[in-house]
Amino acid sequence: MAADKPHMNLAVIGHIDHGKSTTVGRMMFETGAVPAHIIEAYRKEAESKGKATFEFAWVMDNLKEERERGITIDIAHKRFDTPKYYFTVVDCPGHRDFVKNMITGASQADAAILVVAAPDGVMEQTKEHVFLARTLGITQIIIAINKMDAVKFDEKRFNEVKKELSDLIKMVGYKPEETLFIPISSLQGINIKANSPETPWYKGPALIPALDTFKEPSKPTDKPLRLPIQDSYSISGIGTVPVGRVETGIMKKGMKVSFMPANKDGEIKSIEMHHEEIPQAVPGDNVGFNVRGIAKGDIRRGDVCGPAEQPPTVADEFTAQVVVLQHPSAITVGYTPVFHCHTTQTACTFIELKKKLDPRSGQTKEENPTFLKTGDAAIVQIKPTKPMVIENVKELPQLGRFAVRDMGSTIAAGMCIAIQPKQMR
């Protein structure tokens, strides 16, 4: 059913306990993505426990308990269909690797739903997630004002929260006038699949129909080819077969290519996807390809393949805009954590802290700060300890974002805004 529909990755973001999982669960439930036999099993159990009314929240609690017990109904890769799209819900914040995944492209979201609880309004993580979504290039967002049942579906409260959110999203560059704000109750299923009589004052679409107002993400086929290598195999009788996903541009048979920072050249002999030979590969395609002139030891994970005439950019240094997500103390000049960018993991040094920014408005708050701490946004100068490919986020955003990791956690997220390239030839 999904093959002929465009696919979108959807991030569900918002403050803890504002109802993200319940909203995802409810959307899956309403679109028929939670198998009937699971619902039936819960219904029977509910009856046996004397819960005459079968409540959706109870299903969600059970799913949660089962996850805690280690029995997974695969809510990690949650997918559901709308009339227009099929959606995969990518890791929601709260998962440790959410930020890293979002940035390194393991789950680059095309759009987001921001869930905000009506009684609370904008909270700390609401701000952080909105800022991150914007920093990470999510241009389309729908706002679900949840737990409307807790405020008796009061239009006045809805409008107060809407105003607060409009101010917040405007600061980071979303347009409130083009954004849908939907009053919902995920627990009660209000305004999820269809408009409810509980909110006669609300004239917009319910949440699931609203998802079909998202624009289909365009494939960056007009950009130069960039294919970060995930792995490289040596296959007898064929030769070297690198494997990876096309991020931008088009790979064609017969094309002359360069691998950076390995600084090796070759020619594409054949391209394969799902064990079938294809004449060309476009963004989103996971392919294996055979290259004439390349030996197995020449290239490795983290190298990037591009056209010989427009090879991938190797940075000697680069300027980045970063947001510090969590650091036990402070980041100072000389700090050298690992940068995860496309498929590379390279240790890089903070060589200059240029300025601290107001994370919400992007205005300069302080020139040449001495340190950065959790919650700070800044412009910094970075020097990789060994050659690595990174691109300017304005030109090739897919290779311009990165996560900064240290001691097993994501310290910061960022994007490359200028590069001092290394001359490779």
Swiss-Prot record:
Q: What is its EC number?
A: 3.6.5.3
Identify the residues that bind Mg(2+): 21
G1: annotated span: 14-21
> Which residue ranges are recorded for the region named G2?
70-74
Output the lineage of the source organism: Archaea, Methanobacteriati, Methanobacteriota, Stenosarchaea group, Methanomicrobia
Where found?
Cytoplasm
Binding annotation for GTP: 14-21, 91-95, 146-149
Name of the protein described by the UniProt record: Elongation factor 1-alpha
User: Which parts of this chain are annotated as the region G3?
Assistant: 91-94
- Asked whether the UniProt record includes Lipid biosynthesis among its keywords, one would answer no
Q: Mark the transmembrane ranges.
A: none
**Which gene does this sequence derive from?**
tuf
Segments forming domain tr-type G? 5-221
